[in-house]
Amino acid sequence: GKGAHLFTRTYANGLALLAILTAYPDEATAKAKIISGGPFNGWSYYELIVEALDLIKWYQGDGDKRGSWFYGITQTASRYDGSTQQWPTMVIKAAEDRWGIVSPQWVIDNAVHAMQNRLSSPGGGIGYSSGSSSVDVGKTGGGLVTYSLAKMPLNDPVMANALSYAGANWFSATPRKEGGPGWVSNLYAMFAIKKGLDLADVETVTTSEGERDWQRDLSSWLLGRAENLPASFGSSKRSPAYSFGQNADGTWEDTWVFIARGGKNIRAAVGVGIMARGLTDFPPKPII
């Protein structure tokens, strides 16, 4: 097909496509639901995702930009960018897990090449334009998404190195805005590492404080539950201004990507996404 997109920017397009993929549990349901109105009038949601995946494949970089994705989605990627890589691979992984749509192996191989050979630091963390540029836990979560898409086992040296980096920097209270690798006050980083650890199917990370339930730590920060966190961790940032606890209207503040993009509604959605158990597959709900 000619491809389709919901937004022209990689972040927003990925979030919107993930919402569709998680709204319908399987291929049959997605094929049965027909869009009424707008540019995709008469299409099924399944057709829309297939076309969106075609575009994702098309704008992946080639040659010396092999496997890259950049901010805009209507032209081939012009450089490597560790912050954008995770959104296309997240959609590809969700399409496979939810609806059984398997993308060509070359797309996945190229994505791994970008993360492993162009963006990874020796310590396993993922950087911005290279493995020595703005390496942090958030972008490393994006690396874990890509490695999980490629079905790397946990004992693969590449996967193990990335997990080790995440654990070693788990309790850094210095986020990217302040030049550090941590996730505190950074909803983008929190959602990114949540995606990566969830898809890697690990329940704990090995940190300076021992084994930690990463989901509990992230959720505790967002809910303002100080009793669940080490006393010294981010002690100067324990206020709603740093995403520690919700605002009165149930939303969160942010200090990075979502401070100026999307408004409070997207911050609320991302906050809930961070705390939700699962990303492409969700635990069964008990019947009470």
Language-model features: locations:
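An alpha-helical repeat/solenoid feature that recognizes helix-turn-helix modules
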Residues: G1-D54, W58-D109, Q116-P283
